[in-house]
């Protein structure tokens, strides 16, 4: 999994931390890296996630934009439109924390760290911090594909057009 060069660089980084912090807590990690005990690499690198490809990041931005710029403003302007307001997909539910973790983490980064998508952010509590607890990827893909192909990603959609996308 790690080349000898990568192991050497990481081991040296931990040796520097050991000196700076004047602690022996890094000795085990240094030994794992120097000896090449691959079975324990996940303990060292477990908090480093796989990359989210640009296309997947754009997909997440698209679905959040749909809710933030299309659905939420419509709901604010039309508070008596109960069909849309009560529609099961009238708000962004998030992604499944078990099977769609990288998407959920990216949403949290965008909303919590970058402070983007303010209309969507208000649903954090309602959605268990954007953990839908069930797969949403296919549903969102259908919605984004319809929004792109049929409506050219317009922001000023009519009621029927919004419902069409929510029902995708």
Swiss-Prot record:
SUPFAM superfamilies: YfbU-like
Organism domain of life: Archaea
Keywords: Plasmid
One Pfam family matching this protein: YfbU
UniProt cross-references to InterPro entries, sorted A to Z: UPF0304_YfbU, YfbU_alpha-helical_sf, YfbU_helix-hairpin_sf
HAMAP family on file: UPF0304
NCBIfam families: PRK05445.1
Similarity comment text for this entry: Belongs to the UPF0304 family.
Name by which UniProt lists this protein: UPF0304 protein MJECS11
Protein source organism: Methanocaldococcus jannaschii (strain ATCC 43067 / DSM 2661 / JAL-1 / JCM 10045 / NBRC 100440) (Methanococcus jannaschii)
């Amino acid at each position: 999994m790690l080349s000898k060069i990568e192991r050497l660089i990481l081991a040296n980084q931990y040796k520097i931390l050991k000196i700076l912090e004047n602690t022996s807590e890094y000795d085990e990690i240094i030994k794992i890296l120097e000896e090449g005990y691959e079975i324990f690499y996940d303990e060292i690198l477990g908090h480093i996630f796989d990359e989210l490809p640009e296309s997947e990041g754009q997909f997440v931005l698209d679905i959040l934009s749909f809710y933030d710029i299309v659905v939420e403003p419509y709901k604010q302007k039309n508070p008596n439109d109960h069909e849309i307001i009560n529609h099961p997909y009238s708000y962004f539910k998030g992604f499944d924390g078990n099977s769609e973790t990288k998407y959920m983490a990216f949403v949290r980064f965008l909303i919590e760290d970058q402070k983007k998508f303010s209309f969507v952010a208000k649903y954090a509590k309602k959605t268990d911090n954007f953990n839908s607890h069930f797969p949403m990827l296919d549903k969102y893909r259908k919605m984004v594909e319809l929004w792109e192909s049929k409506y050219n990603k317009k922001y000023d959609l009519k009621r029927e057009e919004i419902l069409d996308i929510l029902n995708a």
